[in-house]
Amino acid sequence: MEFRGDANQRIARISAHLTPQMEAKNSVIGRENCRAKGGNPGFKVAILGAAGGIGQSLSLLMKMNPLVSLLHLYDVVNAPGVTADVSHMDTGAVVRGFLGAKQLEDALTGMDLVIIPAGIPRKPGMTRDDLFKINAGIVKTLCEGVAKCCPNAIVNLISNPVNSTVPIAAEVFKKAGTYDPKKLLGVTTLDVARANTFVAEVLGLDPREVDVPVVGGHAGVTILPLLSQVKPPSSFTPQEIEYLTNRIQNGGTEVVEAKAGAGSATLSMAYAAAKFADACLRGLRGDANVVECSFVASQVTELAFFATKVRLGRTGAEEVYQLGPLNEYERIGLEKAKDELAGSIQKGVEFIRK
């Protein structure tokens, strides 16, 4: 019967990710021993909110990333189902699922990169600030877990409103004594993706050939595309500038309204989050000249946080770039963005300090 025992052990080992909470603590087939053979060495990544609208697609995309060796999927509901589904993909990353607050610490321990899309989505008529009351508490709890279990991890924060949740995360980490401003990155990549796409449509180019810096924040007028700095260099009429700026700023609303109550920009956001996460992993690997836009602690303006291009490296955002020359339209837009951002940042700070 030794053969049957070996077979049962193999079955338990490969299925441990489906119900990790049921693994015996003294088992020789614990989670740390569950590794696919032949996988390339890589980074350990956790997605918090993996069963949500963004999280499911993001889990799929991160499972496909060759730089990921271990992928932890956490949520308060439905995490086992998403984990089982994604784990059947024949890519190198080993997947583990974690369900509920009691398993948050296990999900986070030892992670190199933590991606947080957790929270409620936007619905028709809602602004990102309408999400604040619920999502602020979620981000606080999750970041407390990060501070305790993987204080050196790079954090990619997606949960809206990013203009407030990034300051919330910073205050949580400061309280815990683990704050490293280079490692807290608000994900604004979707604004850049939209800008590249919409500008490419106007210019008749492939979006992959276009690069539009988008600075400021991640909501409404705080989203400021710098069309004067588009690559390849291009000129636009005043009407085109107005059209492009408004469409980029309201891209999220465009999707929410088009889905008519059935969701928000989950697919494009997952794509953008995966793209930014890949950039962070390439930075961690030591690749040179990895540059993306992100909402980070900044001295570019008088505000504590601001989205600009950053150079990503082994320690996170290793360099924050200046804005560069702005035209009159952009200078006016910058002042509007800063006025709005100041209140959003303060709102996040006060949520923790109150």
Curated annotation (Swiss-Prot):
Q: Which GO terms describe its cellular component?
A: peroxisome
- UniProt-annotated location(s): Peroxisome
Please describe the organ and tissue distribution of this protein's expression: Expressed in rosette leaves.
Q: Please name the GO terms of the biological process aspect recorded for this protein, alphabetically.
A: glyoxylate cycle; malate metabolic process; regulation of fatty acid beta-oxidation; regulation of photorespiration; tricarboxylic acid cycle
Query: Which residues are the active-site ones?
Result: H218 (proton acceptor)
According to the record's subunit comment, the protein's assembly and interactions are: Homodimer.
Per its UniProt record, what PANTHER family does this chain match? MALATE AND LACTATE DEHYDROGENASE (PTHR11540), MALATE DEHYDROGENASE 2, PEROXISOMAL (PTHR11540:SF52)
List the gene name: PMDH2
Q: Which family does the record claim for this protein?
A: Belongs to the LDH/MDH superfamily. MDH type 1 family.
What is the protein's given name?
Malate dehydrogenase 2, peroxisomal
Query: Can you tell me which residues bind substrate?
Result: R122, R128, N160, R194
One Pfam family assigned to this protein is: Ldh_1_C
Instruction: Show the PROSITE patterns listed in the entry.
Output: MDH
